Structures are given as C-alpha cells and as structure tokens.
A protein has these predicted regions:
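Short, solvent-exposed loop/turn segments at secondary-structure boundaries
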Residues: 39-42, 77
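Short, solvent-exposed turn/loop segments enriched in Gly/Ser/Thr/Pro and often Arg
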Residues: 65-74, 130
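Charged, often glycine-rich, active-site loop that binds/positions anionic groups
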Residues: 71-88, 142-143
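Active-site neighborhoods of enzyme catalytic cores
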Residues: 92-157
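Non-catalytic terminal extensions that flank enzyme cores
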Residues: 1-39, 50-66, 86, 90, ...
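Non-catalytic interaction-recognition regions
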Residues: 41-45, 49, 63, 132, ...
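Short catalytic/ligand-binding loop motif for oxyanion handling, primarily in non-cytosolic enzymes
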Residues: 35-36, 72-75, 135-138
Length: 157
C-alpha cells in the first residue's frame, strides 16, 4: 500500500488509476437513500475515494461525486417507517414527506445523517441529488442526444 501525504493508497486502487487514460477524471459513486444508510453504503464511497486518492497521487485532475438517487420511487417500507407510509409506494423519495418532520423529505431524512458522517470522516465528495439535477434541466441535452442516437446506443449496449 503506497500513500500520499495523508491518504494511504491501496494497491488495487493504484492499479485502477494506472489503467485509466489521462484526466481530467470524474469518479461517481451513489445510492438510493430509501432507508437507513449502512456500512455497505459507506463502502461505496470509500472505494471511490481510494480511486480518487490514487489518481491525485499521480497528479491527475479528478472530481469526486456522490450521486444520491433521490428521484427513485419508494419501493418498500424500511424498518422503523410507519406502516401508513405504504400510501407513498411508487412516489419519488424526494416527494415523500419525512415521517419525523425533521427534514424536507424522506430522502433527506436518510441522506442528511450520511452526509454528516462523511463530513466527520473528512471525505471530500460533491453530493448531487438526482431530483435537483432533473428539475434544473441538467439531463435535457444528453436525453435529446440519446433519443437522436438510439440505434447506435442499442448496438453499444
């Protein structure tokens, strides 16, 4: 395991960084904040952070993004969530009210404490919420482009 001045670089992360072409790079991780966020979700971020640190150690420009899929629908009722929340099944997590009233939405109820944990761990990551990206029109151009090239995309996929 090599390291930069403050971050150890696991060997596998260095291999990943070495396999990438020249930057700039964007490393994206993410989850759907539909229930209590756990150590498995944290692993998602820490794997990305290891690759980011390996790229930085090589002098590469890199942007680290955590994508919170807040537009995902509520698919099931998480432990501790009132049973009457079944009425919100199928609704966007960003539009379901917070059951305790302490956050703006169901998604934020679970995402907020996770973001705080990342801050306390000094993980430097840009958190993006999918519902905000959609509402801002961020995906409009790429969606148009994808629709114009569906045949080519089918061949690739």
């Amino acid at each position: 395991m090599s390291s930069t001045s403050s971050h150890p670089i696991p060997g596998w992360a260095a291999v990943v960084a070495d396999s990438l072409g020249p930057g700039p790079h964007v490393v994206v991780t993410g989850i759907s904040p539909s229930g209590n966020i756990h150590v498995g979700n944290l692993r998602e971020v820490l794997v990305g952070e290891a690759v980011v640190n390996a790229l930085k150690a090589k002098g590469e420009a890199v942007r680290f993004v955590f994508h919170a899929d807040t537009i995902d629908p509520l698919r099931k009722i998480a432990p501790g969530v009132p049973k009457d929340y079944e009425r919100y099944l199928g609704h966007s997590l960003s539009r379901v009210p917070d059951m305790e009233g302490c956050h703006d939405s169901y998604a934020e109820h679970f995402l907020g404490p996770f973001e705080e944990a990342l801050r306390r761990m000094e993980v430097e990551v840009e958190v993006l919420r999918s519902h905000e990206l959609y509402e801002s029109g961020f995906y409009a151009e790429v969606t148009r482009e994808a629709l114009e090239h569906t045949g080519e995309l089918r061949e690739i996929l």
